[in-house]
Amino acid sequence: VKTDSIQITPELLSLLSEIDEFKGAWRSLGTLAPERLNALRRVATIESIGSSTRIEGSKLTDREVEQLLSKLEIKKFDSRDEQEVAGYAEVMETVFHAFTDIPITENHLKQLHRDLLRYSVKDERHRGEYKTLPNNVGAFDQEGKMIGVVFETATPFDTPRRMAELLTWLKDTRELRRMHPLLIAAVFIVNFLEIHPFQDGNGRLSRILSTLLLLQAGYVYVPYSSLESVIENSKEAYYLALRQTQTTLHNESPNWQPWLMFLMRALQQQKRHLAIKVERERKALSELSELAVKILDYVRDHGRVTTRDMVRETGASPNTLKATFSNLVEKRLLVRHGGGRSTWYGLL
């Protein structure tokens, strides 16, 4: 892995500093109460799962993902989209809870891949094993149709050797602290995606590995704000940055800048979104009545809320609730949908 051509430009240095500053602030803040953090993590997890599977062509909305997650115990998923979401959700939970116990080795990568595709019927033959057929990367339109080859990946023959070299580079570079941990993660991911070691699921696995690398490097706020949704919102730029760097990886001096800048800006967006959410939570809780806090708790847990829901939950009068809802809408903490009897409220 040729990293000598990485240029630490003033903008890149500024991004690294801003992200690290937030990492330090998060650790010292004590941030929010555990139940508030759990609510944030739940929302971020739903966004991450929805976005990461949609980037690959799934059509499930965040709302459908949320409904599916509430039925995970059933272990019966009819569509391919549902199978992919279920696998992604389980691996995300594993990473969040056990990131200190998952060394990034060939065995663990294959285990994560096997778990990721656990419910995917069409992937039964190859899950948990490196590819045996070529799998050049295509770009997909919103209908899920392939609209062209983005780049050619490693051959099945070269894949085991290339992965062994990449994993050795990762282990050595982390142990010797030769590079900033965010740059290590970026270099690993772009190489992993250029090799594309598994027959399918590489994109999803790369985003799970990004989270794992960040958590292991001490960026413990990552589960509370979705990086995947930032990437989904700039999908064209994501593919372009990947392609611009990946096509140079075998050159004497690879061009790392497009990918490094894309990923660092995405990480900047991720932490800024979280800072806004935390500030909004703090402000909300310091200024709100007990009833308003209960309404916000309910909508975070259920995705939506009606006056009838809160009459049932709190016993408050409809008139008091209507006034409280109006206040929350005014403060831009909730948004009103529908009208009349079918009015409901959701988070912005």
Which residues fall in each region the model found?
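FIC/Doc superfamily catalytic core
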Residues: 1-348
